[in-house]
């Protein structure tokens, strides 16, 4: 299993059996990312919400690779109107990908307009995802969100993610203090911070976040990734 970071909230996850999943593929306009968008392959693209720094290059990558996009009904409808395959789902629902990997959509506290079109369109709710791999290992991508109680009572207590990808940038999402609380509630083995240091206004000291988490939470390790780096497990 491999989790590759492109910067901001963009990740590529390769499952144990080789399924390639992109999440929020903000690539070509991402100042932290040097990967050419035309080199990126995917089987599935997950979009947490409609903002341009998360929807990113989803249409181009899907068109090039034949990937299917998974998102809320509103975003999936928009994608289908562009001639791209999409699966619509909503919060609390689960879809199976090739009978290998399950994707569950979770709540997030944010907005979700499709803001890069000539006229802004409704994007439905902002969301996160819990991805259950072939081995049963679970990865939580929180999307853009503030701290909310279901991180503990639903995502932490019920889904129990092994690895959590959580925003720390503040201003548009939770900052490092609330993100450390989220990490405590989730009780994941591994926490990978995201959505920081991309633009002015979301600059954060990731090492301070890591120290806060590891000082407060026994059994949780923070793994800050630079764009282009990856985290792997057998």
Swiss-Prot record:
It holds the Pfam family Lactamase_B_2. InterPro entries: Metallo-B-lactamas, RibonucZ/Hydroxyglut_hydro, UPF0173, UPF0173_UPF0282_UlaG_hydrolase. Coiled coil: none annotated. It comes from the Archaea. Keywords: Hydrolase. One of its GO terms (molecular function) is hydrolase activity. Belongs to the UPF0173 family. This is UPF0173 metal-dependent hydrolase Msp_0516.
């Amino acid at each position: 299993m491999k989790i590759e970071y492109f910067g901001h909230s963009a990740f590529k996850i390769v499952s144990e059996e080789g399924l390639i999943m992109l999440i929020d593929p903000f690539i070509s306009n991402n100042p932290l990312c040097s990967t050419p968008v035309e080199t990126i392959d995917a089987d599935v693209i997950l979009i947490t919400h409609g903002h341009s720094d998360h929807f990113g290059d989803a249409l181009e990558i899907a068109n090039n690779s034949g990937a299917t996009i998974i998102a809320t009904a509103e975003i999936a409808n928009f994608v289908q109107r562009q001639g791209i395959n999409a699966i619509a789902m909503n919060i609390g629902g689960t879809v199976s990908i090739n009978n290998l990997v399950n994707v569950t959509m979770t709540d997030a506290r944010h907005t979700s307009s499709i803001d890069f079109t000539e006229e802004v369109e409704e994007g439905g709710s902002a969301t996160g995802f819990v991805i259950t791999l072939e081995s049963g290992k679970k990865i939580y991508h929180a999307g853009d969100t503030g701290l909310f109680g279901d991180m503990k009572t639903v995502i932490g207590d019920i889904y129990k993610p092994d690895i959590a990808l959580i925003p720390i940038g503040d201003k548009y999402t939770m900052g490092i203090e609330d993100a450390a609380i989220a990490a405590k509630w989730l009780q994941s083995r591994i926490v990978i911070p995201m959505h920081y240091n991309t633009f002015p206004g979301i600059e954060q000291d990731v090492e301070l976040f890591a120290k806060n988490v590891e000082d407060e939470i026994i059994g949780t390790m923070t793994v800050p990734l630079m764009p282009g780096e990856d985290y792997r497990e057998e």
